[in-house]
Amino acid sequence: MKIIRAKNYQDMSRKAANIISAQVIMKPDCVLGLATGGTPVGTYAQLVDWYNKGDLDFSEVTTVNLDEYRGLPKEHPESYWSFMHRNLFDHVNIDPAHINLPDGTNMDAEAECKRYDEVIRSVDGVDLQLLGIGHDGHIGFNEPHDAFDLGTHCVDLTQETIEANKRFFDGNVDLVPKQAYTMGDRKSTRLNSSHRCIS
């Protein structure tokens, strides 16, 4: 593992964007595993800037997102589908058919988890996975104590996570979804990734 130190958030965002852009340039049809939350916003802004300058081409890129709230329509402003479109997808030339997120409106958890694991397998895994680490060490909606061999699964959000996320829902804890779909670390899915960028 290589540790890259950053002076501040802006520096970290640029360094993470450098890693992603190098992957896209080196393998134009790469599969990027993407994350949401406050941490990658600056990284996505840098990628959009480079795209606008003609330095990046996302036309062959496929993306697989880490997680999505269960029960939240994708058009909801706080769905991760909306987040990704607002911060990246709507600003670059990615093919909408190459964008993959868990379907938060599918209330059949077993079927949705199987479907998303199959999506990941169908693209031969992830070339580069962008991850953020939460305040308590969670990655995606995987808590630190969760089993390491899970594929995509449905989780009940901890009260701590619900409290932390209420800032996105007008400070109202009752509006925060109580469950989510999240990728796990099972080798047949995400651990195919050859590189990870954890910020």
Residue ranges and their predicted role:
Residues 136, 140-185:
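Class I SAM-dependent methyltransferase SAM-binding "motif I" and its flanking Rossmann-like core
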Residues 1-32, 110:
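N-terminal glycine-/serine-/threonine-rich phosphate-binding loop
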Residues 26-52:
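Glycine-rich N-terminal segment of FAD-binding domains in flavoprotein oxidoreductases
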Residues 30, 38-43, 118-144:
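A glycine-rich beta-strand to alpha-helix segment
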Residues 191, 195-199:
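Single conserved hydrophobic/aromatic residue that forms the stacking wall/gate
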